[in-house]
Curated annotation (Swiss-Prot):
Annotated S-S bridges: C117-C127, C145-C154, C268-C379, C293-C338, C487-C519, C528-C546, C534-C580, C538-C554
Protein name: Semaphorin-6B
Alphabetical list of PANTHER family matching this protein: SEMAPHORIN (PTHR11036), SEMAPHORIN-6B (PTHR11036:SF10)
Native species: Rattus norvegicus
InterPro entries, per database record: Plexin_repeat (IPR002165), Semap_dom (IPR001627), Semap_dom_sf (IPR036352), Semaphorin (IPR027231), WD40/YVTN_repeat-like_dom_sf (IPR015943)
Positions in the Extracellular compartment: 27-605
Length: 887
């Protein structure tokens, strides 16, 4: 019998949850909240550019929304590259909340280029001229490239007047075709270095050098060892090389499917290409290495997706770049900031190479004795063994062509990230750094921008004496930069309109320039006025831009200020400064714009999994138990039906019929006890082919017990013995087999219409049949004339019907001859007719199951021979066949 399983003890489940919580807490240490959060109402005070011109407070009526692509700051002037337009905006301090352009250049695609673009299947909004390259070529010239309806074009413009200088030139390999594609570009020594795609389908990625006095060079075309779906992020010039930062699919991890890694590649400025045989008009100095930004441990946790890179800055006397990395979109959300020393970057390019000997093999380091000399990737120059790169031996050029990847990765300073943030909603994608913050210019502030314009401000303290490690970074402030009232609401602009394009520091004005597709917002780097009136809040903010003045105000401190102030960026105790009503940290840190720690995310996921597993276990157990309970109840019902009638194990049909006639229903009385009426008890016993409705809907005494199966009616099968005796009355015990043969022969030539009529019930009358005595069947089951026999129910194909064979003499008094027979056998019938005074040849003997009923009243007269009921031997159909009586 099924018994429900006991639920697991609750203390064990709680202990498991607490253990998992502690493990996740150890894996993802909780991150401190910001010391302050700027109120959102301060956004309305930030100046914003939305395309307004001189003398206009708002853009002209009917003007399109901006679609900004590039922003370039040159001294106190900001150039904004838009769709079909180029704006010049002055950044002089102003009390106005509106930034207006002083000059505007309209640069649209010509109709023929638009028509060709539309013919290529592009949308009308894509067939425009999007400014994708915006550079300062010299002190007075701007170099601008636009997508020009998927036919890139470049031109030079005067920086002061925005007038065209010279003719337009092709933008192929200088500017992407699609405005959604990433690209980088810079000028170095009068030469343009670009990283983009060179075709309409964006398949051929390239690092390209053009303009200047040196030949144009490019990377090897369609070689996955050089590039595999790169996404270019930034480019910097340092020493005799130009460094390109990008991310791509790593070919060295091709056995792990698509793994994105961050790279840095470099080329020599003075490279002139290879020989006519190898690498002609292609880079001979191109090498690339992996950038390693990971959390150390037994198994490093990598931040592989490069998002943004700063220029080369000096930190502690070292040339350093800061880069923002994030996790892949299908991983735990998180971002990190790592710093890289350019000297270490250069050292990696002097290390070992990595190679793949066959397409199926893994990548392995190249032994040093197999590296040719001079070293591949070096910058050939006058005074060296080879004066130019095109003079290098083919062995070196071939090695460079097939071995562009370095074996070692570039380590980050301190071998760990300087800043790690785990965000649930938006990753960090932009970075700006101020290495001269504070009144003495000796503090480093890092601004990190998220995808939707939220900026996080950190104070970092590099320690140059200990391998470039940094102490714990201090999360100073969190503030918003996107103005929905001017740049568009999130519902209308969507994620695209709120995407942060660039974040640039304007140290002269003490602000940040945050560019979005529809606007540019200038945000102050600090909000010191929030702490005015409370010395503890001002000093406790640890903000290098803020100081406490003697007049009781918190003021903004510019580099080199001569004002008197108090400041403590080391985070010393402020307990002696008294308390302030409404401490800012407590009042403003509650709302963190949806930034959720990974601790909560992982803990919730684990808890949901455990609870779901427990609930699922209980549910499965309950359903299994329910099925067992139903099966047990079904067995009990069957036993109750079979055991109906008290202590008797089985009720025969005749006994049940007698109880019906007498009105006793067993334990419960006449159909009123627990057993219910006999019809209800007998209905479940009916098998396929028996009409239960006819049984249950009959009259109170219409139950024919002869129609129901009983154990007496289904004896074991009897073996039939062959016989050839022509006289049935002399066969004795073998008459059954002989009658079966006769019935089979008759059934093939005759069709008998069965007629079954019911007669009123009469009391049973004893009758004599030779030496035996029995009770005749009721009228409903007796033959009214020699051709009528009891009707038997239609048999199911699965039902086995066996009746007892006749063994005694035939009772001639049981059949009347007053009615004519409906069927006469042929004269050749093998059944003999009895003489006027002869006895019957056989007696129809019924089992006691057929004796429940009443006999037909009247005298007993000699009758013709009647065969036994052998209908079970005939085939089933719409009507059953019965052996005819002997005339």
């Amino acid at each position: 019998m099924w018994t429900p399983r006991a639920p697991p003890p609750r203390p064990a489940l709680l202990f498991l949850l607490l253990l998992l919580l502690r493990v996740t807490h150890g894996l993802f240490p909780d991150e401190p909240p910001p010391l302050s959060v700027a109120p959102r109402d301060y956004l309305s005070h930030y100046p914003v550019f939305v395309g307004s011109g001189p003398g206009r407070l708002t853009p002209a009526e009917g003007a399109e929304d901006l679609n900004i692509q590039r922003v370039l700051r040159v001294n106190r002037t900001l150039f904004i590259g838009d769709r079909d337009n180029l704006y010049q905006v002055e950044l002089e301090p102003s009390t106005s909340t509106e930034l207006r352009y002083q000059r505007k250049l309209t640069w649209r695609s010509n109709p023929s280029d638009i028509d060709v673009c539309r013919m290529k299947g592009k949308q009308e909004g894509e067939c425009r001229n999007f400014v994708k390259v915006l550079l300062l070529r010299d002190e007075s010239t701007l170099f601008v490239c636009g997508s020009n309806a998927f036919n890139p074009i470049c031109a030079n413009y005067s920086m002061d007047t925005l007038q065209l200088l010279g003719d337009n030139i092709s933008g192929m390999a200088r500017c992407p075709y699609d405005p959604k594609h990433a690209n980088v570009a810079l000028f170095s020594d009068g030469m343009l270095f670009t990283a983009t795609v060179t075709d309409f389908l964006a398949i051929d990625a390239v690092i390209y050098r053009s303009l200047g006095d040196r030949p144009t060079l490019r990377t090897v075309k369609h070689d996955s060892k050089w590039f595999k779906e790169p996404y270019f992020v930034h480019a910097v010039e340092w020493g005799s090389h130009v460094y390109f930062f990008f991310r791509e699919i790593a070919m060295e991890f091709n056995y792990l499917e698509k793994v994105v890694v961050s790279r840095v590649a470099r080329v020599c400025k003075n490279d002139v290409g290879g020989s006519p045989r190898v690498l002609e008009k292609q880079w001979t100095s191109f090498l690339k290495a992996r950038l390693n930004c990971s959390v150390p441990g037994d198994s490093h946790f990598y931040f592989n997706v490069l998002q943004a890179v700063t220029g080369v800055v000096s930190l502690g006397g070292r040339p350093v770049i800061l880069a923002v990395f994030s996790t892949p979109s299908n991983s735990i959300p998180g971002s990190a900031v790592c710093a890289f020393d350019m000297n270490q970057v250069a050292a990696v390019f002097e290390g070992r190479f990595r190679e793949q000997k066959s397409p199926e093999s893994i990548w392995t380091p190249v032994p040093e004795d197999q590296v040719p000399r001079p070293r591949p990737g070096c910058c050939a120059a006058p005074g060296m063994q080879y004066n130019a790169s095109n003079a290098l031996p083919d062995e070196i050029l071939n090695f460079v062509k097939t071995h562009p990847l370095m074996d070692e990765a570039v380590p980050s300073l301190g071998h760990s990230p300087w800043i790690v943030r785990t965000l649930i909603r938006h990753q960090l994608t932009r970075v700006a750094v101020d290495v001269g913050a504070g009144p003495w210019g000796n503090q480093t502030i890092v601004f990190l921008g998220s995808e939707v314009g939220t900026v996080l401000k950190f104070l970092v303290k590099p320690n140059a004496s200990v391998s470039g490690t940094t102490g714990p970074s201090i999360f100073l402030e969190e503030f918003e930069t996107y103005r929905p009232d001017r740049c568009g609401r999130s519902s209308s602009a969507g994620e695209w309109g709120q995407r942060l394009l660039s974040l640039e520091l304007d140290a002269a004005s003490g602000g940040l320039l945050a560019a979005f597709p529809r606007c540019v917002v200038r945000v102050p780097v600090a909000r010191c006025q929030l702490y005015s009136g409370c010395m503890k809040n001002c000093i406790g903010s640890q903000d290098p831009y803020c100081g406490w003045a003697p007049d009781g105000s918190c003021i903004f401190l510019r580099p080199g200020t001569s004002a008197t102030f108090e400041q403590d960026v080391s985070g010393a105790s402020t307990s002696g400064l008294g308390d302030c009503t409404g401490l800012l940290r407590a009042s403003l840190s509650d709302d963190r714009a949806g930034l959720v720690s990974v601790n909560l995310l992982v803990t919730s996921s684990v808890a949901a999994f455990v609870v779901g597993a427990v609930v699922s276990g209980f549910s499965v157990g309950w359903f299994v138990g329910l099925r067992e309970r139903r099966e047990l109840a079904r067995r009990k019902d069957k036993e109750a039906i079979l055991a109906h009638g008290g202590s008797e194990a089985v009720l025969s049909v005749s006994r049940l019929g007698e109880r019906r006639g007498t009105g006793t229903g067993g334990r419960g009385g006449a159909g009123g006890g627990p057993g219910g009426p006999p019809e209800a008890l007998l209905a479940p016993l009916m098998q396929n082919g028996w009409t239960k409705a006819a049984l249950l809907h009959g009259g109170p005494h219409d139950l024919d017990s002869g129609l129901l199966p009983t154990p007496e009616q289904t004896p074991l099968p009897q073996k039939r013995l062959p016989t050839t005796h022509p006289h049935a009355h002399a066969l004795g015990p073998r008459a059954w087999d002989h009658s079966h043969a006769l019935l089979s022969a008759s059934a093939s030539t005759s069709l008998l219409l069965l007629a079954h009529t019911r007669a009123p019930e009469q009391p049973p009358v004893p009758t004599e049949s030779g030496p035996e005595s029995r009770l005749c069947a009721p009228r409903s089951c007796r033959a009214s004339h020699p051709g009528d026999f009891p009707l038997t129910p239609h048999a199911s194909p699965d039902r086995r019907r066996v009746v007892s064979a006749p063994t005694g003499p035939l009772d001639s008094s049981s059949v009347g001859d007053d009615l004519p027979g409906p069927w006469s056998p042929p004269a050749t019938s093998s059944l003999r007719r009895p003489g006027p005074h002869g006895p019957p040849t056989a007696a129809l003997r019924r089992t006691h199951t057929f004796n429940s009923g009443e006999a037909r009243p009247g005298g007993h007269r000699p009758r013709r021979h009647a065969p036994a009921d052998s209908t079970h031997l005939l085939p089933c159909g719409t009507g059953e066949r019965t052996a005819p009586p002997v005339p």
